[in-house]
């Protein structure tokens, strides 16, 4: 233990001074102008950097230390104040406040360190203490912190950030540096300094403004401001560069001055590179110290007020994007798509063949839009989104190939009925050079009908021809006014020459020319779009019960002329789709007066559109017209008639009367319109055009060359659309059809961007939820983040358009920046848009920058990591299939890494996914890399920059000695004073109390540099070093935690063994302490064509090992179907396989498994009905899933399948079937080769660990509904050290509490307040339980929704936590009664809040519950998720090698014996590889000393981790025992009241530390000294009869037990501390394994759950 002495361990605290007295002054404003006081504080600190002044509680506090004697005149009236506070001198009274304490009053530090809550009757300060002293105590620490941060910032050591600062790790990466001053009652002033490296912030210089895309791969980031730390969003989230401006105005000068005053740094904005400003919108939620939903962290806000901020004063936090395998990724942006990548390909191939073959005869004219596809809509090229490209914008773009990362940046704006032209550069030469089409030939082709699709679904070409024959009359009746105003010669503007000449024409001109460049002086109307079978929206496949559907007469003939109606032109929020006239103007229902501007179209073009838009007219026809027959299809009503058009009446709530008449699009990638193709076009490469404010990358435009291609379902059905569709949302999803109508577009100001070499819209900087984003039907509820509610939808145009409509043009970049912005006055029709005539109000630049600088945001609201998995991908996978069942299907995701779930049956889902996240045996550690993080101690900036030279690092021993012992007097104290006179001053160590007196009399501080402070500091440090070397620590404050023993059963006898013996379970022939558990197993996996025989081998090995470990018996599931159900498949040998091809997505695999498990339920029910007794209802069923999918969301998807099975069992009334699940990675058991998979060699150790883990997770019985599951072992309770007499009141000081019940409960709420997770455990592992909840921000809904019980509020969660605790207390009490005749004692609930103190909204419920249940006594703790690497040895490593042989070898890795002689029996098995027994005979023939330390020479963990070597080399010493040094933990209870990491400004009742040497530090060459992992335990509240030292020691001993339970319950990796190689990944895994070895299991369980669950988006 001498190597880990407290005097040699330095902490993360710096001592900045020792104070005797502190004086403070309080100043108030005459005019109650609080802002003037704030500005005065900035000015004073800038003029006097070392002054202690702060604004708090509407007052200005000024502090001085008594030994400095700083006069009040330091705060001079002659301070030059900036222009923003010219009259500050007249507003602020610089004299003392007469109601406060007297200026210069000598207040002791103890009074400020522990201010009284109320003034006593004898107080000299009287009522003034009540009013000012508590604020003065907080203000002193606040002023010291501000002063330190200001000086460090001024010297360039740090940058202010939020309530702390950031420090540079290198040129780009920044970490948060936590600086917290502490004032002890004895006058010591300390500073805590810890760097949190888990949050990685990047400097804005990572983005090169000249060539952004070349230096920044995939820009998905969050912007934070320096110095406030406020999160901001881009003003225009569609385009990063368009937010940059170069502005030098009075407002920006004021901002620069404020930043200089607050940070002490004068930033230069002289050069062009430095003078870059960015338009940002502050996140109001973050301003209130609240975090946005982590699962949707990239989003936009409804606030339209922007600021201009220097780009150099921004920090970026990038999201983590999980790479998706190209084969399984639904990425259709590339030119090659796998033929069966879509679930509907088999059906799509047949339909596409019919469509494409018939379309050659049905083509009426060249399409008037550029071919359209899903990829063109969902891909983000050039400028995507609202206002990113105005009607007069052209951009030259270089080819840009999308990689997998680009998927996360694509946003779909076409859900909001907003239109935008596409530049002519995207027209390929093949399309422009198309040969002209003869009009007569086209006329003949239009007479052909697609009979197969039209007979059933209506919308035939007869109606289209009839409408075209009468187009003139129809046009005059409906849209006569609009036609008369337009010039008639605009029809001739369609030649290729005109196309090359007029690149800035509107969207419809471009579309016409591009599709028919040689159409001459006329154009033929577009073919009418028709619905097909696959395009029936999902919401139209059911008839709402309360809706009265119109009479459907499939035999009624179609009218020659649909009855005309008058469109409501001015209704932006019309419930009906836009009419043809509206589409012809701006795509919305605007009147003619509103149709001017960028989307003003020539009337002849409108005529073309109107005549061919009978699809819109059909839906707008009179109610007297016959209605087309669209069958209502429901598949699962009757198997025989399910696909033939069976009608179904939905039982859900009804919809509006107009809703079913609207044009809707289901949430799928299949379009609903036939695509007219000519033979010529069919032979050309099809080029996709962005419809709906979209530019495309050239590389993403090339699709299949033939409609017969395997990807024709995506291309043929979507690529060419009639123009009526190009003016409406092409894939508007059914959830949004009811809420959103058309939105007007204002003039974008005519900005033209030229020579832009990058795809700027690929930068997604917070645009999720914006009009340009892919907010689709499954994410409709983003209120608070998304500005697009129905109330203010008319304001959802681009903020750039708002600004430009107010003539606030963005200054242009010079050509050297790679961008050229010029002004264009061409507006199409020559008229000014309505947005220019009436500027929109409400969008303005904020001029009050003071809150953005002084409002220090709590950095704890910044998530450590956020994922981009839930950003919508390019391709919309279908959520509808032909066999779609009635249940909500959330298995199908947008892409393979999306993490999304519906709220229905969420509790069942959490019940199943919880154990797989927590008790995972470390399987998820390598894949997610989200489990453990540590706080590193960075090299001190105080030492580097010498900002405060008179300071030093505090050793641990200074906190372990009680200063009251030095201050107390005894009888001999006066008699020993002569020793002080005899001894010299330099060697006066005979009397420590006299040294402490001298130490206490020396006053100094590092904040003020002068000669006196320097001399006193050197004297103080010299005395401290002597005291540290001479004073010893007591066992009560610095002690080694005991070795934990476990209980096992051997030959029906209970044994208490070292917990290390659990690793030899099978060899020792142990049995579980409880009864055996029997269950049946069904192994689920995929068959990828490389063999499946290894699965049967693995299952046989597992069953055999489980039996050999005496844990019970596992049986295989065998179920067979009956002749009447040939659709069900038999299950044999407990294996269920699903075929998976290499080009098949895992989404398809999970869907197939889901169907097979539903069939399993039917097989079980048939077995019960037929009484074949193949299924054992008395045994639980294990679903063992072998997972080959490495994506992070695979656990989520598999758990959805398990949830569906459990729901299906409930629906089929099979409550006797009890299931539990286990997900293991395929890499654990399979060695994958290109052509053949092989079973890995699995050691008995791994198989035994897996068997014991399955025993723990198996329910106690099929009929036993106890929430507590028995574990295979329990820990041994320490025997009492003395007899406890309960009639004696000893104040709990010497009690062992053997009869009392302690239940540890750890819980945490995610920082976005959406998830709760809790874990329960007693110190012995008798009861263990975990549970998670989803805490909805909305009101809990019950009734028709059916999922109100799955979403909870805080009160409900706290109630359930308390109820579960009561159940577990009852279980513990029953266990105690069974083992002894005594009744249980008091019940103590150790309530542990992780990563925070208990906030008020939770605290109120805990108080209410504790008052209600007075039989339970609360002990409240606060801990962190992970340990911190903050303690370090002062001595270099291996400094004491000479004394190494005489030391206790504490904290040392076993080096092993060098005895290689083969003459002894022990030498025969000295190699760990030899120690493997394959039969009981080998075990019995082993030498007697085979478990001696020499048998485990090179083992670092696992079975023989760190065995103690024999001190004298004896190999047959019977006293040798196995001991794992990795389990050695030191308990520390400081005598000094230290604050908690989670609450640095609030002292707890007591604090304790768990200390463990970081073994992996020996492998790090960058650390020349030993480092120690520190885990902090802070006591916040307990009953007043507790002795705090006794209670803290008891808790630390409990935590040692709970740490041991990590391996017993299976939270850590099986062989995590056995290093296989020296790779970086292996080192990280060893590091995480070691870090988790000092964290109690229930705290690790909560962390592992929340880390995963917080990234799941719940669709409510």
Swiss-Prot record:
Pfam families the UniProt entry points to: Med13_C (PF06333), Med13_N (PF11597), MID_MedPIWI (PF18296)
The keyword RNA-binding belongs to this UniProt entry's keyword annotation: no
Low complexity bias locations: 702-712
Alphabetically ordered keywords of this record: Activator, Nucleus, Repressor, Transcription, Transcription regulation
Chief localization: nucleus
Biased composition (Polar residues): 104-118, 592-614, 803-837
Ranges annotated as biased composition (Acidic residues): 447-465, 713-722
Ranges where the record places region Disordered: 94-118, 428-481, 583-614, 702-731, 803-843
GO CC term (a single one): mediator complex
Gene Ontology terms for molecular function: transcription coactivator activity
Entry's localization field: Nucleus
Self-association and partners: Component of the SRB8-11 complex, which itself associates with the Mediator complex.
PANTHER family with a match to the protein in the record: MEDIATOR OF RNA POLYMERASE II TRANSCRIPTION SUBUNIT 13 (PTHR48249:SF3)
Recorded family membership: Belongs to the Mediator complex subunit 13 family.
Protein function: Component of the SRB8-11 complex. The SRB8-11 complex is a regulatory module of the Mediator complex which is itself involved in regulation of basal and activated RNA polymerase II-dependent transcription. The SRB8-11 complex may be involved in the transcriptional repression of a subset of genes regulated by Mediator. It may inhibit the association of the Mediator complex with RNA polymerase II to form the holoenzyme complex.
UniProt-recorded name of the protein: Mediator of RNA polymerase II transcription subunit 13
Origin species: Scheffersomyces stipitis (strain ATCC 58785 / CBS 6054 / NBRC 10063 / NRRL Y-11545)
């Amino acid at each position: 233990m001498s190597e880990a002495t407290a005097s040699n361990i330095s902490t993360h605290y710096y001592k900045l001074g020792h104070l005797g007295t502190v004086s403070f002054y309080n100043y108030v404003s005459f005019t109650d102008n609080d802002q003037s006081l704030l500005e005065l504080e900035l000015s004073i600190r800038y003029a006097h950097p070392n002054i202690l002044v702060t604004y708090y509680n509407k007052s200005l506090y000024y502090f001085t230390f008594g030994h400095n004697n700083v006069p009040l005149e330091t705060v001079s009236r002659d301070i030059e104040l900036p222009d923003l506070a010219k009259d500050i001198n007249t507003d602020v009274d610089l004299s003392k406040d007469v109601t406060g304490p007297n200026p210069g009053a000598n207040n002791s530090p103890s009074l400020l360190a522990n201010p009284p809550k109320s003034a006593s009757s004898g107080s000299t300060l009287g009522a003034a203490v009540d009013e000012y002293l508590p604020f003065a105590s907080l203000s002193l620490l606040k002023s010291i912190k501000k002063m330190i941060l200001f000086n460090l910032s001024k010297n360039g050591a740090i940058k202010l950030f939020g309530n702390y600062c950031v420090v540079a790790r290198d040129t780009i990466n920044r970490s948060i540096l936590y600086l917290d001053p502490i004032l002890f009652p004895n006058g010591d002033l300390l500073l805590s300094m810890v760097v949190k490296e888990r949050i990685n912030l990047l400097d804005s210089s990572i983005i090169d403004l000249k060539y952004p895309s070349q230096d920044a791969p995939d820009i998905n980031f969050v912007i934070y401001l320096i110095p406030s730390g406020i999160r901001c969003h881009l003003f225009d989230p569609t385009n990063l560069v368009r937010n940059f401006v170069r502005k030098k105005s009075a407002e920006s000068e004021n901002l620069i001055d404020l930043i200089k005053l607050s940070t002490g740094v004068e930033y230069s904005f002289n050069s062009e590179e430095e003078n870059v400003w960015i338009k940002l919108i502050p996140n109001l939620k973050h301003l209130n110290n609240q975090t946005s939903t982590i699962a949707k962290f990239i989003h936009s806000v409804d606030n339209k007020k922007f600021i201009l901020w220097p780009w150099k004063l921004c920090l970026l936090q990038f999201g983590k994007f999980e790479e998706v395998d190209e084969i399984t990724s639904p990425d259709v942006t590339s030119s090659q798509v796998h033929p069966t990548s879509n679930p509907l390909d088999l059906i799509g191939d047949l339909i596409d063949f019919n469509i494409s073959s018939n379309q050659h005869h049905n083509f009426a004219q060249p399409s008037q839009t550029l071919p359209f596809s899903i990829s063109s809509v969902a891909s983000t090229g050039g400028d995507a989104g609202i206002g990113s490209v105005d009607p007069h914008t052209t951009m030259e773009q270089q080819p840009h190939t999308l990689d997998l990362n680009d998927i996360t940046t694509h946003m779909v704006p076409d859900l909001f009925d907003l239109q935008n032209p596409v530049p002519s550069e995207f027209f390929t030469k093949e399309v422009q050079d198309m040969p002209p089409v003869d009009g007569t030939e086209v006329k003949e082709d239009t007479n052909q009908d697609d009979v197969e699709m039209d007979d059933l679904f209506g919308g035939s070409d007869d109606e289209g021809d009839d409408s075209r024959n009468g187009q003139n009359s129809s046009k005059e009746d409906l849209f006569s006014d609009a036609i008369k105003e337009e010039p008639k010669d605009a029809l001739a503007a369609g030649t290729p020459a005109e196309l090359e000449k007029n690149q800035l024409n509107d969207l419809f001109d471009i579309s016409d020319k591009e599709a028919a460049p040689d159409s001459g002086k006329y154009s033929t109307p577009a073919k009418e779009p028709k619905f097909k079978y696959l395009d029936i929206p999902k919401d139209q496949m059911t008839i709402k019960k309360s809706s009265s559907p119109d009479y459907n007469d499939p035999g009624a003939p179609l009218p020659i002329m649909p009855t005309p109606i008058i469109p409501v032109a001015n209704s932006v929020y019309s419930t009906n789709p836009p009419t043809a006239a509206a589409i012809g103007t701006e795509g919305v229902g605007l009147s003619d007066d509103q149709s001017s501007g960028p989307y003003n179209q020539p009337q002849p073009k409108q005529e073309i559109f109107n005549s061919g838009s009978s699809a819109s007219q059909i839906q707008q026809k009179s109610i007297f017209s016959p209605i087309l027959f669209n069958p209502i299809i429901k598949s699962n009503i009757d198997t025989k008639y399910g696909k033939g058009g069976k009608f179904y009446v939905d039982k859900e709530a009804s919809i509006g009367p107009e809703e079913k008449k609207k044009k809707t699009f289901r949430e799928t990638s299949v379009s609903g319109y036939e695509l007219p193709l000519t033979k010529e076009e069919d032979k050309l490469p099809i080029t996709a055009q962005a419809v709906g404010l979209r530019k495309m990358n050239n590389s993403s435009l090339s699709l299949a060359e033939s409609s017969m291609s395997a990807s024709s379902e995506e291309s043929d059905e979507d690529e060419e659309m009639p123009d009526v569709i190009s003016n409406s949302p092409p894939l508007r999803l059914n959830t949004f059809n009811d809420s959103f109508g058309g939105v007007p577009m204002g003039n974008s100001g005519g900005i033209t961007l030229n020579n832009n070499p990058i795809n700027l819209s690929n930068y997604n900087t917070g645009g999720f939820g914006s009009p340009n984003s892919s907010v689709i039907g499954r994410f409709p509820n983003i209120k608070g983040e998304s500005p697009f509610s129905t109330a203010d939808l008319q304001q959802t145009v681009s903020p750039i358009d708002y600004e430009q409509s107010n003539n606030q043009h963005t200054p242009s970049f010079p050509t050297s920046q790679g961008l050229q912005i010029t002004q264009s006055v061409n507006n199409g029709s020559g008229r000014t848009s309505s947005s220019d005539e009436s500027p929109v109000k409400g969008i303005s630049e904020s001029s009050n920058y003071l809150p953005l600088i002084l409002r220090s945001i709590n950095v704890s609201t910044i998530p450590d990591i956020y994922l981009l998995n839930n950003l919508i991908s390019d391709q919309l996978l279908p959520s509808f299939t032909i066999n779609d069942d009635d249940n909500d299907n959330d298995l199908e995701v947008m892409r393979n890494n999306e993490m999304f779930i519906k709220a229905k049956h969420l509790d069942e889902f959490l019940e199943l996914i919880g154990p797989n996240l927590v008790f995972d045996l470390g399987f998820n550690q390598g894949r997610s890399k989200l489990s453990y993080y540590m706080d590193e101690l960075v090299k001190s900036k105080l030492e580097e920059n010498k900002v405060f030279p008179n300071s030093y690092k505090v050793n641990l021993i200074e906190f372990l000695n009680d200063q009251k012992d030095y201050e107390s007097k005894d009888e001999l104290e006066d008699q020993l004073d002569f020793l002080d006179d005899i001894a010299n001053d330099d060697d006066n160590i005979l009397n420590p109390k006299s040294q402490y007196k001298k130490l206490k009399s020396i006053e100094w501080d590092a904040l003020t540099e002068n000669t006196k402070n320097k001399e006193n500091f050197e004297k103080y440090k010299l005395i401290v070093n002597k005291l540290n070397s001479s004073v010893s620590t007591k066992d009560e404050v610095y002690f080694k935690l005991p070795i934990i023993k476990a209980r096992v059963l051997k030959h029906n006898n209970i044994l208490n063994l070292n917990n290390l013996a659990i690793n030899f379970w099978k060899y020792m022939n142990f049995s579980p302490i409880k009864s055996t558990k029997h269950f049946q197993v069904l192994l689920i996996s995929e068959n990828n064509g490389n063999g499946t025989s290894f699965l049967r081998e693995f299952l046989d090995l597992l069953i055999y090992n489980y039996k050999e470990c005496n844990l019970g018996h596992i049986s295989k599931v065998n179920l067979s179907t009956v002749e009447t159900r040939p659709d069900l498949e038999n299950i044999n040998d407990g294996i269920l396989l699903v075929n998976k091809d290499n080009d098949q997505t895992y989404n398809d695999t999970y869907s197939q498994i889901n169907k097979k498990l539903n069939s399993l339920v039917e097989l079980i029910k048939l077995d019960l009905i037929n009484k074949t007794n193949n299924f054992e209802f008395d045994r639980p069923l294990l679903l063992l899933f072998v997972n080959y999918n490495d994506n992070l969301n695979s656990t989520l998807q598999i758990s959805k399948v398990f949830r569906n099975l459990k729901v299906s069992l409930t629906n089929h009334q099979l409550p006797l079937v009890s299931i539990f699940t286990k997900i293991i990675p395929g890499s654990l058991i399979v060695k994958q080769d290109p052509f053949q998979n092989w079973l890995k060699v699995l050691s008995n150790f791994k198989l035994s660990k897996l068997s014991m883990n399955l025993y723990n997770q198996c329910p106690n019985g099929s009929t036993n509904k106890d929430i507590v599951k028995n574990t295979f072992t329990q820990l041994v309770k320490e025997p009492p050290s003395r007899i406890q007499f309960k009639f004696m009141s000893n104040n709990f000081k010497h009690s062992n509490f053997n009869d009392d019940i302690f239940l540890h409960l750890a819980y945490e709420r995610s920082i976005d307040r959406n998830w709760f997770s809790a874990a329960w455990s007693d110190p012995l592992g008798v009861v263990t339980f975990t549970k998670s909840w989803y805490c909805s921000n909305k009101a809990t809904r019950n009734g028709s929704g059916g999922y109100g019980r799955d979403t909870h509020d805080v009160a409900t969660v706290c109630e359930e936590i308390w109820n579960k605790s009561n159940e577990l207390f009852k279980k513990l009490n029953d266990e105690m009664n069974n083992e002894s005749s005594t009744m249980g004692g008091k019940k103590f609930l150790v309530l542990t809040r992780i990563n925070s103190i208990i906030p008020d909204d939770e605290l109120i419920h805990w108080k209410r519950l504790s008052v209600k249940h007075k039989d339970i006594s609360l002990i409240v703790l606060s801990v962190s998720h992970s340990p911190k690497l903050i303690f370090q040895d002062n001595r270099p490593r291996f400094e004491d090698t000479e004394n190494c042989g005489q030391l206790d070898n504490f904290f040392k890795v076993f080096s092993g014996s060098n005895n290689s002689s083969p003459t002894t029996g022990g030498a025969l098995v000295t190699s760990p590889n030899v120690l493997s027994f394959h039969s009981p005979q080998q075990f019995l023939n082993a030498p007697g000393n085979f478990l001696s330390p020499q048998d485990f020479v090179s083992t670092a963990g696992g079975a023989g981790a760190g065995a103690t070597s024999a001190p004298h080399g004896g190999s047959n010493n019977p006293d040798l025992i196995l001991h794992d040094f990795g389990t050695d933990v030191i308990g520390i209870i400081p005598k000094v009241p230290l604050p908690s990491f989670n609450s640095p400004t609030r002292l707890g009742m007591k604090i304790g530390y768990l200390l463990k040497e970081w073994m992996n530090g020996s492998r790090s060459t960058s650390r020349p000294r030993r480092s120690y992992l520190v885990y902090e335990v802070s006591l916040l509240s307990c009953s007043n009869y507790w002795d705090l030292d006794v209670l803290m020691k008891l808790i630390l001993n409990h935590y040692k037990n709970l740490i041991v339970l990590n391996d017993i319950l299976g939270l850590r990796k099986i062989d995590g501390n056995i290093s296989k190689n020296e790779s970086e990944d292996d080192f990280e895994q060893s590091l995480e394994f070691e870090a988790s070895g000092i964290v109690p299991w229930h705290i690790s369980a909560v962390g592992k759950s929340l880390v995963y669950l917080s990234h799941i988006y719940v669709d409510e």
